Amino acid sequence: MNLTKKPLVIVGSGFAGINTALNLKKFDLDIPIIIIDSQPSFLFKPLMYEVLSGEIKQWEVTPNLETIFSNSGITFLQNKLCEVDFSMNILKFQDNLHIEYQYLVLGTGSSHNSFSIKGVDENCYFFNDINDLDKLKIYLQQTTNNVKKDNLFIVGAGPSGVELACKLSDLYSNRFNIKIIEKADEILTKNKIFNKEEAEKALDKRKIDILLNTTVEEVTEKE
């Protein structure tokens, strides 16, 4: 990549990366701005639940990043970062591309954490990105002909866990007994009381069991 000036590079194109890039551009900085991600599309995570239910299509929540940054003066580069040499200010990529930067912003987001619990990575589904969503959809499709209800456990009673439980109950209450496992003594521990009360009403209406003060020690294969 030929650059006359060392760029400001943002690694990661989630909400943080995109907003940082667009807001920095408003300052009319006299250096190139490059945003880099291994994926070609942005994922609007708050609507993953609606994609799961089929209320909206997957393409509606995954706009193309080149399109987002077209005519913005920001360069989007799809590539996978392998190493950062902080002493030399150099980024090294999967295809042997090296970029020397002037400023670096790391906004690579989060990944799931199994907390070293045995069997989690092998026997659980996650809900953090499009690949997770696709895997969960395939599993749910495979349960279409279930003769009896299975127990479906969701670990974590934060906003994501509660919303996912409600959505799955709306779609598959005839296939699953849905239960939420939470290690704390209440759901939505960081939310306002009103939000907790409304969430409890939604869960109670759907007859979703909440197992508080409960931790997972191991996850085994379904028998």
Describe these PLM feature segments.
Residues 1-5, 9, 73-151:
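FAD-binding core/adjacent interface of flavoenzyme oxidoreductases
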Residues 140, 144, 168-172, 207:
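Short, well-ordered alpha-helical segments in soluble proteins
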